[in-house]
Amino acid sequence: MTSLVLLRHGQSQWNLEDRFTGWVDVDLSPAGEAEARRGGELIAAAGLEFDRAYASVLTRAIRTADLALAAAGQLWIPMQKDWRLNERHYGGLTGLNKTETAARHGAEQVMIWRRSYDIPPPPLAPGGPFDFAADRRYAGVEVPATETLKSTLERVRPYWDGAIAPRLRAGERLLIAAHGNSLRAIVKLLFEVSDAAIPGVEIPTGNPLVIELDRAQRPTAAHYLDTARAQALPSA
């Protein structure tokens, strides 16, 4: 049996501004920094230790991992960063204010783009300020023009199978600092959540989700360390 902790990055500046962020490399807000440190303090208080950490290649996830691990006294552990743990790409919605977008397109349509499992937002036009094709982080990667939760899962799964799952099988204790949708994809894999149910699974920012796994990597228990900000979980 081993443990896995999922940590959604703390509030980012664009979370604060209520903008669709996706792959844009926005930093944490001051409140988000405090959330990340608090997550690390909760990890320390729970006596959790890690052998390795994982993060996306986006600053808000990397800094969340760093701040949490520093607060937990474990900043020294190795950390692997990979684009496949990035947030879902919001396509043509990237950078837009969510409230203003709902006023323009209708709240129901925007909710479909945000929460449906397999209906994508409009694609991002190439060559604009949020075209990541030339970003060195994605050298050799076919950068998507838009993504759904389903396509996010399809890129997370190979990384999970090839990089993360073998470490868990070896008994390593892991921290994954990532994003609402990439972590939702991992929860779907582990708990076998249905396509219909997974859009309703919420993962709060900066609140460590501890998942105990058996030797077959099936969840046996799961809980948030900050119970006051916990969200409902699939049955373990």
PLM regions with names:
Residues M1-V5:
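Extreme N-terminal starter segment of soluble prokaryotic enzymes
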Residues Q11-A71, V143-P158, G200, P208:
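Loop-to-helix element that buttresses phosphate recognition and phosphoryl-transfer chemistry
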Residues G39-P129, K188-E212, A216-P219, P234-A236:
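Phosphate-coordination/substrate-recognition cap region in phosphate-metabolizing enzymes
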Residues A55-S56, I176-A178:
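Short beta-strand segments
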Residues P121-T148:
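Glycine-rich phosphate/pyrophosphate-binding loop
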Residues R155-A170:
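Phosphate/ATP-binding catalytic cores across multiple sugar-kinase/actin-like superfamilies
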Residues G180-A185:
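GST superfamily/GST-like fold recognition
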Residues D226-A236:
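Acidic, His/Gly-rich catalytic cores of divalent-metal-dependent hydrolytic chemistry
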